[in-house]
Regions:
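Surface-exposed, interaction-prone regions used to assemble/regulate multi-protein complexes
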Residues: 1-159
Length: 159
């Protein structure tokens, strides 16, 4: 994370992140800025928050251009089970350039068994350059997912 800072006693300080988003608002498409700056997507008490949600799938696709099967792009589709287990949160990244998944062998935070990556602790969106954005996600295991993309979709499906 570049703008969301961990507190020494636990938790995260979003103040610098909110300021950063204000400073880059004009360079983000409205729907990406709306997602990034909506406190509901970060708030521990919001049912729509990614905080405490569980990753269920992270699919990397290479769809072919209908005009030429040789031309392909990278797309990532993610599905999270909401923290109250009553909804799915879908994130879709189009025009993906760089993407990384880093997971430590040992867990950073308890519980330490049979939890996969654990719950999502915090996430932030950033501007990489004109037309390219990054979404970084940190999980309780210590896993970090990073996607650089040109287009983004977000939707919620109630169960």
């Amino acid at each position: 994370m570049k703008h969301i800072i961990p507190y020494p006693s636990g938790g995260y300080d979003h103040a610098a992140y909110w300021k950063y988003l204000e400073s880059v608002q004009a360079t983000m498409p409205a729907h990406i800025f709306e997602f990034a700056s909506n406190s509901e997507n970060h708030d521990l008490n919001s049912q729509n928050s990614l905080h405490d949600s569980w990753l269920e799938s992270w699919n990397i696709l290479e769809p072919a251009d209908p005009e030429s099967r040789r031309r392909r792009s990278i797309q990532i589709e993610a599905r999270f089970l909401g923290s109250n287990w009553d909804r799915y949160i879908y994130l879709t990244y189009h025009g993906v350039g760089r993407h990384e998944v880093l997971s430590p062998e040992e867990f950073a935070l308890p519980p330490t068994s049979k939890i996969g990556h654990g719950d999502l602790l915090v996430h932030e969106m950033r501007v990489v350059r004109d037309g390219l954005f990054a979404h970084e996600l940190l999980f309780s295991r210590g896993s970090v997912f990073l996607v650089e993309f040109s287009e983004f979709k977000h939707r919620i499906e109630l169960l």
